[in-house]
Amino acid sequence: MYTTAGMSSVPLTMPSPTHPVAEGDPTPDALLVDRLRKGETAAGEALVRKYYQPLVRYLQRLVGNEQLAEEMHQQTWLSVLEHLDRFDARHVTGGFKAWLFRIATNKANDYWRSSGRERAAKDGLRRVTDEQLPPADFRMEGTEQEQKLKWAIEQLPDAQKQVLMLRYYSNLKFIEIAEMLGCPLNTALGRMHKAMLKLKDLMAD
């Protein structure tokens, strides 16, 4: 159960990682956020349940550690509660989901930047490729080809890897990716374009 000074009347219970929760709550995020602001605990817990699995999976692939991902998941929701009054869906492309994942990305970036964590950051990016579904153009059969694809993805600059992961693992729209990364849409598109060209060159060798 988690609260913040600004919303002490709204405790949220985090799901247990040993008890998976259902995704796809049909209630619109905007409605749940509005109810949460009014102090409805159930609305906050519905949001947590809705995004628990994709958010934890995303964090786990960023930091490469299940326990750490769970901790960052909790920290992310604490930040959501702390800054919920500042959230305005009219000014956030992609809505609450984009805002939530951007907070999570910032948590991971803070971890990467902390003292002695540079190697862990690179390891986390490599782990992203382990279960990453590649673009259709690059789906191949055979262990050797799969290993070559993983190797090729590892050669990409970190910024390009991150866009690739968000697009093909989290299945996000580019406008949402840009909002999460805090960059212009054209920048996100450009990184993806360069990543695809680089992958084609590497796979052709």
Predicted regions and their residues:
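Arg/Lys-rich amphipathic alpha helix in sigma70-family domain 2
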Residues: 85-86, 102-123, 142
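Structural recognition of an alpha-helix C-terminal capping motif at a helix-to-coil junction
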Residues: 71-78, 94-106
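Amphipathic, Lys/Arg- and hydrophobic-enriched alpha-helical face
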Residues: 48-66, 83-86, 153, 202
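Intrinsic, short, N-terminal disordered tails of RNA polymerase sigma-factor systems
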Residues: 1-38, 46-50, 119-161, 165-166, ...
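Short, charged helix-capping/linker segments at alpha-helix termini
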Residues: 23, 37-46, 56-75, 185
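DNA major-groove recognition helix of helix-turn-helix
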Residues: 112, 192, 199, 203
